[in-house]
Amino acid sequence: MKKYVDVILPLPLPKYFTYSLPDECAEEVEIGCRVIVPFGRKKFYTAIVRNVHYCAPTEYEVKDISALLDASPILLSTQFKFWEWLADYYLCTQGDVYKAALPSGLKLESETIVEYNPDFEADAPLSEREQRILDLLSVDSQQCVTKLEKESGMKNILTVIKSLLDREAIFVKEELRRTYKPKTEARVRLAGSADEKRLHILFDILSRAPKQLALLMKYVECSGILGRETPKEVSKKELLQRAGVSPSILNGLVEKKIFEIYFHEVGRLNQEVKEVVELNALNEFQQRAHDEIVQSFQEKNVCLLHGVTSSGKTEVYIHLIEETIRQGKQVLYLLPEIALTTQITERLQRVFGSRLGIYHSKFPDAERVEIWRKQLGEKGYDIILGVRSSVFLPFRDLGLVIVDEEHENTYKQQDPAPRYHARNAAIVLAAMYGAKTLLGTATPSIETWQNARNGKYGFVQLKERYKEIQLPEIIPVDIKELHRKRRMVGQFSPLLIQYMKEALEQKEQVILFQNRRGFAPMIECRTCGWVPKCKNCDVSLTYHKGINQLTCHYCGYTYQLPKSCPACEGTELVNRGFGTEKIEDDIKVLFPEAAVARMDLDTTRTRAAYEKIIADFEQGKTDILIGTQMVSKGLDFDHVSIVGILNADTMLNYPDFRSYERAFQLMAQVAGRAGRKNKRGRVVLQTKSIDHPIIHQVIGNNYEEMVDGQLAERQMFHYPPYYRLVYVYLKNHNEALLDQMAAVMADKLRTVFGNRVLGPDKPPVARIQTLFIKKIVLKIEQNAPMGRARELLQRIQKEMLEDERYKSLVVYYDVDPM
């Protein structure tokens, strides 16, 4: 009897598609395996098998699958359940979830672009088909799969591509900016035997070459070669630094056959783990918090740990992790920002060693695929540390989920679908496994705070800072008055300059916070007021001095800064506003001797860049760190005594009902970076709104007063946590047609939802990538059945798209928008 499979395609399709199984693989296919399938006229995709059955569909002609890619499933049953929940709750398709969930190396398709890996060395003979593909790529190193299929004359080419990808002979489009070459480190060892007698002979030989002798002696010291059975491995970089000699001295010893240099792989998955240490004992306050969390988990599945900045929440997490993995269960530890993984990784590896796996988008795709496959086996990592995409990984027996800095809006995926919130998704995922979830932060989101206070979540507080470090002193500075008196130096108040100077003189560090990247948010012609706008989007372009270009932060469009105004030919083009790049420039003028680094999206596009900025600041190589909100997110530095918040008003004046909450969180978090064990930190908060209630609440660290004020307003105006929000976005290239379609859809929604519907209106940015945008807001009572609301929304969307006039309408939803 003929077998069929229902598959999920990596496309926004509302249903599964059915394919027939050829007899040769009919018994091998399992739910969760990948298959290559034809779709459309000439395209092939990697699909995931959802069901295996014997029922042929009647509405379309069934095609055979082209190939089976897996001998065993790459998706577990709980993951399918999780995908279904995400698609249903966030009003998207399982195809959308599939595209977001899997590393690109696991979802090849006809349009995938592949590139030859120049570092590839075959460890086994290539098949004739594999060699043919590599021959074609050696002529043109970047080609799409469709073109390779045409030129090679092969059928089922995706199986060959998969094989070459597994062998790392090629890499796929998403990874073209990264290298697959394993990260290696040059190390030094003695050539030949290393006994005491030979060392004495070498010392005699080098007696007339003092620098070479000093290098050899330093190697003996670093490696511990005389006191150990197995000498410690010594890196070339460390040896040269500690001996204080140039590479030519080492090269001389290599030529004399005394030393040899070899390369050791230090990639993430093969990273040499230092000796594992015992857990640190918790102090009295941490222990009490730990015990209260454990007690809370007896009754509730979710617990909020509200701990002030620098209270030692991570140490509490580590003890809970250790107890969970001792029970044979796995832990998922979520962070809002890739930058944070660098610091936390070191702390966790010291305790858990190779039981820890790290997963995020800055890793090459091959490494992410490797972690995914490892998690499917019996010997998966006990702990996964990662950012929001880590919720998609397979787990055999998840016991605990930790969501650190749970209030951060970076946990929310903005584009494309699924527009999920990783914190909320993680809570649901944990429930599916019967696991517990711990939410940790110094400044909880108002929704989480409300859930904790009304008893839905457990609630534990940790009010004392670790080792009695004092909370910083926050000093507000009225820059409106200083600007009026012309006492500002660029963007810096005299007080901030004085404090920075004192800190640098005392060898302390400074963090400056400005939540806008680039050099200037806007360029303006002083003569006629012309402002350069993006040709694709309804926004002004940001000037980036480093590349001397104007850039759109929405679509990436760039063009050179004109020498004169194209409207009036005036030559006075002036900067309006300031970003991190401008601050960096100004600081280098004010403090030319200081080592300055900038941490924003432009300077941290690679994993290595993140790590270097953080490591240099930790080691005291950087004196002043300038950054966007990245610097506010839980990073711990011992020598920061001054934090400058350069312009609080940009946060307070943002047109969003959450702006006051976010402003408080950002300012409180960045302020928490200041302070040392024996010295109280200082925060200079520059603002033109010196009497604003939020400014006073930040100064007094009065979180609860801020929350009470915001809750009263939100209840009055029907916002979360009292109401749920769904934003309905409509897009089209034709603005007039879009206006008409948006009005019709809003009317249809009002017939069902009544006055819960607001709009349609233009969002703050009303055109992106040549598409005009309209937004309809839906406010639904917290206790209303959301499942029914979702059904009605999808029914109305279907009605719209079935109307011939509205075929070109693009509709998508943002559920629980941030």
Go through the PLM ranges and name each one:
Residues 277-283, 287-290, 299-739, 747, ...:
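Inter-lobe coupling/hinge segments of SF2-like helicase ATPases
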Residues 1-384, 390-441, 453-469, 752, ...:
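Accessory, non-ATPase domains that flank or precede helicase/AAA+ motor cores in DNA-metabolism machines
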Residues 591-594, 749-757, 802-807:
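Short secondary-structure junctions
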Residues 747, 751-772, 811:
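A carboxyl-terminal module marker
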Residues 15, 235, 724-726, 772-774:
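Short amphipathic alpha-helical segments
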Residues 91, 103, 153, 168, ...:
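Glycine-centered secondary-structure boundary/capping sites
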Residues 39, 56-62, 66-72, 644, ...:
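Solvent-exposed, membrane-proximal periplasmic/extracellular interface segments of envelope transport
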